[in-house]
Amino acid sequence: GELIRKSAMGGYTLSYHFMDLRDEKTNIQEKTAMDKPHHLMVYITDKNNKPVLKGKVGFMIKNAQGITQKAMGMFMSEGFGTTADMKQKGVYTISSKAILGDKKLVDKFEYEIR
């Protein structure tokens, strides 16, 4: 997926990647039938640039109308990912909270769907 944000905090780097799963589909009916066609991943690395493989990550995605989706990230491909419905054009506020042992990392940013 496309790198949409990179932030550093508390000795960690968080890299967010965004992907529209509909891009992989060729059948128009499959594309329109997808409830949550967007995939959001965060890859977390420590100060030595090693991937963080244990922890919990939660996502909160709010659209321009204030409708919020909450999801726990699943560990996959050395990162934490979730699916979401971001089909409506506009600016989304994406918040993440990562619990890594005794460390808590909270991040928030905006991403526009055009």
Which stretches of residues belong to each language-model region?
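Short structured motifs
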Residues: 2, 25-28, 67-69, 78-82
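Edge beta-strands of extracellular beta-sandwich domains
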Residues: 104-113
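A short beta-turn/strand-edge loop motif at beta-sheet boundaries
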Residues: 49-53
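Beta-strand-rich structural segments
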Residues: 36-48
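Beta-strand-rich domain onsets/edges
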Residues: 1-39
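Short, solvent-exposed, Trp/other aromatic-anchored flexible loops in extracytoplasmic proteins
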Residues: 71-100
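Short amphipathic beta-strand segments in non-cytosolic proteins
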Residues: 58-71
